[in-house]
């Protein structure tokens, strides 16, 4: 064996550049960090975004350190997703990978650093959105789970469940026209967009229901009055998370 070959074999391995993300294949609960992660999930029209906004305002009034993030909002990926939708080029797998790239970017730049920085992170939809929607489009559930294994596990995952007809009616009554992918038209379920949307949302609802026990969802009734539902949500947050960890600013009112 010559000297050059021996040096190559004995040379120490160079570690790749470090990332703020946990290593792939090793999911790390958010409780491993000083911060806390609260997530809302549910079908379109379930009321999840409204409730998270109200919770966010309540915590902001209290002066707590928090950060809000929402699904499919990374500026790095958003334009590519938009172009793919406009040209109707997205297959279920391509769509799923774009969403995963979007989430990975936000996870590394926002979610993980803020959890490490002792912040309360509020997420309007999380990896369970991909598990439900992408599985409804035919992506293998196990493949999806592996794709997002780097994601920290939420401290609380609220699942706002509303009957299919109620949720669909809320969306249809507030939208002049459903978008192509939103309605699930790429799946060939129906030529009618409203009917395709109903069928697609039914598939998504079924996928969400499968995750209730395995992913420790806190199920809330999306049909009860907004104020009553918000009270339930706040009570669960206060009883599950020590909000004093997030140091209200001096002079700010503490949430009741």
Per-segment meaning from a language model:
Residues 2-31, 56, 172-256:
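NTP-dependent small-molecule kinase module
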Residues 30-57:
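Walker A (P-loop) phosphate-binding motif
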Residues 37-40, 120, 157:
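Hydrophobic "anchor" residues on beta-strands that sit immediately upstream
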Residues 60-152:
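ATP-dependent small-molecule kinase phosphotransfer cores
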Residues 69, 160, 220:
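Hydrophobic residues at beta-strand termini and immediately following loops
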Residues 73-75, 127-128, 162-168, 226:
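Conserved nucleotide-binding/hydrolysis micro-motifs of P-loop NTPases
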Residues 130-203:
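A glycine- and Lys/Arg-enriched "phosphate-lid" helix/loop adjacent to the NTP-binding pocket
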């Amino acid at each position: 064996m010559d000297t050059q070959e021996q040096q190559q074999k004995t040379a120490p391995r160079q570690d790749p550049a470090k990332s703020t993300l946990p290593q792939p294949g090793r999911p790390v609960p958010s409780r491993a960090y000083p911060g806390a992660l609260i997530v809302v999930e549910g079908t379109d029209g379930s009321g999840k975004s409204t409730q998270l906004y109200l919770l966010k305002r309540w915590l902001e009034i209290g002066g707590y350190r928090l950060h809000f993030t929402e699904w499919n909002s990374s500026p790095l990926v958003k334009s590519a997703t938009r172009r793919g939708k406009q040209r109707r080029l997205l297959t279920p797998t391509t769509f799923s990978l774009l969403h995963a790239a979007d989430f990975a970017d936000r996870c590394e730049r926002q979610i993980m650093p803020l959890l490490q920085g002792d912040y309360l992170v509020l997420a309007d939809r999380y990896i369970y959105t991909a598990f439900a929607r992408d599985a409804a489009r035919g992506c293998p559930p196990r493949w999806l789970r592996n794709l997002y294994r780097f994601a920290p596990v939420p401290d609380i995952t609220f699942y706002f469940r509303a009957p299919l007809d109620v949720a669909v009616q809320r969306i249809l009554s507030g939208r002049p026209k459903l978008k192509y992918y939103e309605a699930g038209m790429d799946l060939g379920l129906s030529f009618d967009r409203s009917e395709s949307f109903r069928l697609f949302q039914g598939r998504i609802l079924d996928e969400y229901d499968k995750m209730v026990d395995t992913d420790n969802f806190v199920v809330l009734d999306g049909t009860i009055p907004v104020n009553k539902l918000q009270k339930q949500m706040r009570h669960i947050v206060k009883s599950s998370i020590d909000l004093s960890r997030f140091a209200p600013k001096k002079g700010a009112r503490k949430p009741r």
